[in-house]
Amino acid sequence: MKDSYISIVIAYLMVTFILVSSMPIEGEKGELGPHRLPCPPEYANYCFNGKCVHVVAQDEPGKPCYSCICDKFYIGKRCGTLDLTNPDF
């Protein structure tokens, strides 16, 4: 019973992570927002199928953190996975 519960929780967390990581992070007007800046030129190819953004961490302002805004039908940390489950595909 305990193993079954743990498996369900892990599956839930994985699905939640995938959904959250594939959500667009642009503002309503298409702006990056105050804590998201364009990536430096050396990170131009960081995202496989999307746009790179430099996320300014509020708790560690000097630490660089890069994220991707994925193109349509792509998901993942660096937009490298084609989302075949997308109903618009």
From Swiss-Prot:
Q: Which SUPFAM superfamilies match?
A: EGF/Laminin
Q: Which UniProt keywords apply?
A: Disulfide bond, EGF-like domain, Neurotoxin, Secreted, Signal, Toxin
Q: Where are its TM segments located?
A: none
Q: What is this protein called?
A: OMEGA-ectatommitoxin(02)-Rm1a
Q: The organism sits in which domain of life?
A: Eukaryota
Tissue expression as described in the entry: Expressed by the venom gland.
Q: Where is the signal peptide?
A: 1-30
A Gene Ontology molecular function term for this protein is: toxin activity
Q: Which Gene3D superfamilies match?
A: Laminin
**Sequence similarity:** Belongs to the EGF domain peptide family.
Describe the location of the EGF-like domain by residue ranges: 43-80
Cysteine pairings via disulfide bonds = 39-52, 47-68, 70-79
Entry's localization field = Secreted
What's this chain's function? Ant peptide with probable defensive activity which acts as a potent agonist of the mammalian epidermal growth factor receptor (EGFR). Mimics, both structurally and functionally, vertebrate epidermal growth factor (EGF) peptide hormones. In vivo, intraplantar injection in mice causes long-lasting (several days) hypersensitivity of the injected paw to both mechanical and thermal stimuli. Its long-lasting effect is unusual for venom toxins whose effects are usually immediate.
Secreted among keywords: yes
Taxonomy of origin reads:
Eukaryota, Metazoa, Ecdysozoa, Arthropoda, Hexapoda
A GO cellular component term found in this entry reads: extracellular region
